[in-house]
């Protein structure tokens, strides 16, 4: 019983530290210098897996590896910004440059070889409208 309590306590501490690290990573002031690969590693691979092959279990996490839907650069950009189903929106957490960087990384890696890239100015068109509390 004591071992079980210890395992649960250590798991909770590890989870809290991981959530804190993710929250720190998403701070726009600190994250402006990160690469698309780093964004993928810290944000995307938790669900889509390090190899981009996705997962099925408690939920369905689509594969990004060898994904023909990524042929249209707008598709992953819209998904990152707006989310869909279990995929959360990252429009408030990521800048236009960060969205472009992570989309370009995924489209050029993980078995994908799309060479056309998005620029930060392309991302603005895909952003959802600002809510009243974001305007302030």
Task: Show the residue positions of the predicted features.
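Hydrophobic h-region of N-terminal signal peptides that target proteins for export
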Residues: 8-18
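Positively charged n-region of N-terminal signal peptides that target proteins for export
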Residues: 1-4
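Gly/Gly-Pro-rich "capping" loops immediately C-terminal to redox-active cysteine motifs
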Residues: 53-93
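Stable alpha-helical elements in mature extracytoplasmic
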Residues: 32, 72, 76, 98-99, ...
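Electrostatic cytochrome c docking/interface patches
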Residues: 17-39, 55, 136
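The canonical Cys-X-X-Cys-His
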Residues: 36, 40-50, 102
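Flexible coil segments in periplasmic/lumen-exposed cytochrome c-class electron-transfer proteins
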Residues: 19-26, 96-97, 101-136
């Amino acid at each position: 019983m004591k071992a079980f309590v210890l395992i649960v306590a250590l798991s909770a501490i590890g989870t809290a530290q991981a959530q804190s690290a993710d929250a720190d990573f998403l701070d726009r002031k600190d994250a402006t210098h990160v690469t698309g690969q780093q964004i993928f590693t810290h944000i995307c691979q938790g669900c889509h897996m390090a190899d981009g092959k996705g997962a099925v279990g408690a939920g369905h996490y689509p594969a990004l590896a060898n994904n023909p839907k990524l042929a249209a650069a707008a598709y992953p950009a819209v998904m990152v910004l707006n989310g869909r189903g279990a995929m959360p929106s990252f429009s408030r957490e990521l800048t236009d440059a960060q969205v472009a960087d992570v989309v370009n990384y995924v489209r050029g890696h993980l078995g994908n070889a799309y060479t056309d890239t998005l620029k930060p100015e392309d991302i603005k068109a895909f952003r959802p409208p600002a809510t009243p509390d974001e305007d302030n």
